[in-house]
């Protein structure tokens, strides 16, 4: 009888712990889904930009530029409490864009990469820190303090790069 009672008490005590773990897991899955949606949205914004728009936000791809193919790895957004795309105003991400062109394969394509800030809206606004002396300070001015460590980190989403590589191959095969 004591064993059953102890087991029942243990089960009752574990219910809140299991509930909290389930909530945390669902919350994390929701944030992962939101990051995936933001990656898709920002990739689309970058890939639909004209050469002039790319020039305006710091990319210079040259006269023979073809199509822009990008990979995006979001590491933050504002407001940080957002849980849906509709609530997100700014996305902070690492990006890597490659340009298709005459005879340019993925390995030798012209690329631009690094942290970016993208304001979602109509029209969207893409901000890229300009390269050169003082670059780290310009990144710090662009990216909120809470995301700066990630802004200087490595591209974490290798699947996004592989998907961009495959899109690049499809575009250049035509």
Regions found by a protein language model. Give the residues of each.
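N-terminal secretory signal peptides
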Residues: 39-92
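Ser/Thr/Pro/Gly-rich low-complexity linker/stalk segments immediately outside membranes or between
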Residues: 26-41
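Hydrophobic membrane-insertion alpha-helices, especially the h-region
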Residues: 2-26
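Mature extracytoplasmic domains of secretory-pathway proteins
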Residues: 73-129
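C-terminal partner/receptor-binding element of secreted or periplasmic proteins
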Residues: 131-174
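Polar/charged alpha-helical tracts
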Residues: 4-5, 40, 44, 166
């Amino acid at each position: 009888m004591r064993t059953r009672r102890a087991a029942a008490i243990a089960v009752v005590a574990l219910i809140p712990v299991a509930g909290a773990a389930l909530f945390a897991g669902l919350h994390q899955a929701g944030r992962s889904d939101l990051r995936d949606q933001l990656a898709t949205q920002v990739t689309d914004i970058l890939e639909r930009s004209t050469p002039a728009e790319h020039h305006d936000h710091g990319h210079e791809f040259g006269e023979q530029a073809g199509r822009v193919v990008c990979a995006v790895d979001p590491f933050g957004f504002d407001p940080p409490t957002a849980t849906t795309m509709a609530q997100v105003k700014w996305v902070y991400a690492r990006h890597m864009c490659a340009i298709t062109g005459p005879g340019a394969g993925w390995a030798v394509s012209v690329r631009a990469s690094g942290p970016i800030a993208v304001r979602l809206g109509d029209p969207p606004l893409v901000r890229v820190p300009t390269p050169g002396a003082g670059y780290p300070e310009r990144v710090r001015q662009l990216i909120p303090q809470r995301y700066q460590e990630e802004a200087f980190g490595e591209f974490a989403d290798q699947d996004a790069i592989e998907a961009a590589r495959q899109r690049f191959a499809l575009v250049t095969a035509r």
